[in-house]
């Protein structure tokens, strides 16, 4: 661990000391979505969500009421409920499905010397506090992103059947295939997101299937037929990072949803216009596009004072490990988990892009 010493950060003496300049800040888009759960303390490290399968559904197809079969599948359900006079029907039972996620502890910590704290021209500890908040936001976004990328309902661009065979861009037919899958599984459009405040409150949004992906894909998304830019919405306020909608999709972009570099098919396999993009020029970069309906996943949000355990220890506090009180620290720890509650109420589209 590197301690922030007086010499580590060059000063600005004998120069006009300007403002502390703005720096890059992480986007938070996925962490505003999903069902927000606040798990009480001392209740275990394991979060268990439960649902009951509806009539006609199975564990393999928990959202579909009509099994694959020939004939009039709707009439099969009707006939199963015809009651004979004087005959008590056989009782049915309902089947629970439990989904489990273990909550994990995360932390970040900065250190600084007493000389930096007492003599340095800038308030280094204050800047550390600011960056702690931003760093927590970035880590949380990556926690959610990492979990959602593991969704089992995967689609691939350019006739691909795996990430390693992705060879094409996002196209309208691919979007429509995802919509068919979501609607067949009774995935409802998203209608609310976490409010932009340090709370668990939600705010209403215009309904749609929200699609989150990297800002590199903006050009090809805007080129989709039937695309409507966010600035031309008749009603409603676009979300942060939202560039527009195409049919049932609302597209939200962030530079903090990174691609899988060189993970796709060979560049020569590219099926789109021009040349496909590759970091090294060998295999196409693959961009996950996270598409979700309402209540597809849940997360223990890092919002509210109970979710973070901040630390600020200024120099001067003497202990056996620091007998002269020469070191100070600023940091925080927190607990978080992200759970996909219904794999088929969301999907991941894996695509490449044009160079």
Give short role names for the model-derived ranges:
Residues 91-120, 296-311:
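Short acidic, glycine/tyrosine-flanked loop/strand segments centered on an H-E-D-like triad
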Residues 2-33, 165-195, 208-212, 216-355:
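Sequence/fold signature of self-assembling virion shell proteins
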Residues 104-106, 110-120, 195-223:
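Structured, hydrophobic secondary-structure cores that serve as assembly/anchoring elements
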Residues 44, 105, 206, 325-327:
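Extracytoplasmic
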Residues 1-101, 346, 350-353:
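N-terminal "assembly arms/tails" that initiate or stabilize quaternary assembly
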Residues 117-127, 203, 315-324, 338:
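Exposed beta-sheet edge/beta-hairpin loop segments within beta-rich domains
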Residues 116-195:
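Alpha-helical scaffold segments that mediate packing/assembly in large oligomeric complexes
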């Amino acid at each position: 661990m590197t301690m922030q010493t007086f010499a580590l950060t060059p000063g600005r003496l004998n120069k006009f000391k300007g403002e502390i300049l703005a720096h890059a800040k992480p986007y938070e888009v996925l962490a505003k979505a999903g069902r927000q759960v606040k798990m009480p303390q001392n209740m275990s490290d394991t979060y268990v969500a439960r649902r009951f399968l509806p009539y006609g559904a199975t564990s393999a197809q928990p959202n579909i009421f009509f099994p694959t079969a020939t004939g009039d599948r709707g009439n099969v359900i009707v006939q199963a409920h015809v009651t004979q006079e004087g005959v008590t029907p056989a009782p049915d039972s309902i089947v629970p499905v439990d989904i489990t996620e273990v909550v994990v502890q995360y932390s970040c910590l900065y250190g600084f010397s007493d000389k930096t704290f007492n003599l340095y021209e800038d308030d280094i500890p204050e800047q550390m506090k600011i960056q702690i908040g931003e760093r927590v936001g970035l880590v949380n976004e990556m926690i959610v992103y990492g979990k959602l990328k593991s969704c089992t309902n995967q689609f691939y661009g350019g006739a691909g059947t795996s990430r390693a065979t992705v060879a094409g861009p996002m196209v309208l037919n691919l979007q429509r295939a995802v919509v068919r899958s979501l609607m067949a599984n009774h995935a409802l459009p998203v209608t609310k997101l976490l409010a932009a405040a340090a709370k668990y409150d939600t705010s209403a949004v215009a309904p749609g299937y929200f699609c989150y992906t990297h800002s590199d894909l903006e050009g090809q998304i805007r080129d989709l037929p039937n695309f409507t830019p966010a600035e031309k919405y008749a009603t409603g306020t676009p979300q942060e990072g939202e560039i527009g909608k195409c049919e049932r999709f609302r597209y939200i972009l962030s530079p903090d949803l990174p691609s899988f570099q060189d993970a796709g098919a060979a560049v020569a396999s590219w099926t789109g216009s021009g040349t496909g993009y590759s970091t090294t020029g060998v295999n196409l970069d693959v961009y996950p596009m996270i598409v979700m309906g309402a209540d597809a996943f849940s997360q223990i949000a890092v919002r509210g004072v109970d979710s973070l355990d901040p630390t600020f220890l200024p120099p001067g506090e003497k202990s056996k490990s620091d007998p002269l009180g020469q070191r100070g620290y600023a940091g925080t720890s927190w607990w978080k988990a992200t759970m996909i509650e219904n794999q088929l109420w969301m999907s991941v589209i894996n695509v490449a892009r044009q160079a």
